[in-house]
Amino acid sequence: ILAQKGWIAPNWPVEYGGTGWNATQKHIFEEEYQAAQAPRLSPFGLIMVGPVIMAFGTEAQKAEHLPKIISGERFWCQGYSEPGSGSDLASLKTRAVREGDEYVVNGQKIWTSHAHHADWIFALVRTSNEGKKQEGISFLLIDLNTPGIEVRPIISIDGGHYLNEVFFTDVRVPVGNRIGDENKGW
């Protein structure tokens, strides 16, 4: 019901299934939503990758992903952090080498919240080693059901599991899943 009314994404434009509300209307809704103790939804699709796709995605990417994000049909996770990179995201090592109309992705992400539940991951990958480390990074949308992807749990001290490692071994990703220009994902 919330999705049908656009209330799942009150800051999304009406054309993509949101309400088109202004900041005041959105704030009032958020306060009432919290007062009702309604459950929060995962931010990865609605708040993080959805707006990126709206701003920088192709029309085909918008048509493919936005309706499935707002309906809750497609669950996302974020692939940024890597072992050895710490808070220096630009030092990422996961490589995506272009072969024709695909990238071949190899590497690892860590501290990936809810990857074990996600259908897709949006990831920063290194597509070039030339220039400063902030250059040569591209933004890819990757289907987690693609062969070569392994999700391993990171069990917390209390026995909980919401963080994961995600391994990419010769994962083939269509070039059409890149957001924006190659090497301009930073």
Predicted features and spans:
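Short Ser/Thr-interspersed hydrophobic loop/turn segments at strand-loop and sheet-helix junctions
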Residues: G6, F29-Q34, L124-V125, L141-T146, ...
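A short, Trp-centered hydrophobic/proline-enriched beta-strand micro-motif
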Residues: G72-Y80, L124
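A structural signal for short hydrophobic beta-strand segments in well-ordered beta-sheet cores
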Residues: T94-V97
